[in-house]
Amino acid sequence: MAESINSLEELGTVAKTEAAAPVDVQKLDAQGRAYATGKRKDAVARVWVKPGTGKITVNDKEFEKYFARPVLQMILQQPIVASNRAGQFDIVATVAGGGLSGQAGAVRHGISKALTYYEPGLRTVLKKGGFLTRDSRVVERKKYGKAKARRSFQFSKR
């Protein structure tokens, strides 16, 4: 702000020109897909989102086959349902590490991030639903002198 400001109106116009918020743009690869990684516990998911018919593939299998439990299928679909984009995107995910619950959470996190990269306007909806936040809870390590992380060995008075 090297120029001098003489009135409040000039201050307002200078503030508007300098503080123009950067417009969110799509982050797409050469094939027109949005890519994101999601993490949960020990699982890491790599997710690609592209326009399509709503087909979700996890590790080259349909997600209903890979995640057989209905609860895990629901977890996977939460960001799509919350953003009202059911049937509009094809999703391909590869996930490794952890168990099925952690993998479902990792794919959900990756889908949420990829949707915001493809359609930045969805960020507020997904952020409000808590889908963009990395769940940082991991298993607590076992301590020596204990049976598990916190459980002590059985104690006998006599």
UniProtKB/Swiss-Prot annotation:
* UniProt keywords, alphabetically: Ribonucleoprotein, Ribosomal protein
Q: Which GO terms describe its molecular function?
A: RNA binding; structural constituent of ribosome
Listed disulfide bonds for this chain? none
A single GO BP term for this record reads: translation
Q: Signal peptide span per the entry?
A: none
What do the Gene Ontology cellular component annotations say?
Answer: cytosolic small ribosomal subunit
- Domain of life, per UniProt, equals Bacteria
Short name of one Pfam family for this protein? Ribosomal_S9
Family affiliation:
Belongs to the universal ribosomal protein uS9 family.
> Per its record, how is this protein called by name?
Small ribosomal subunit protein uS9
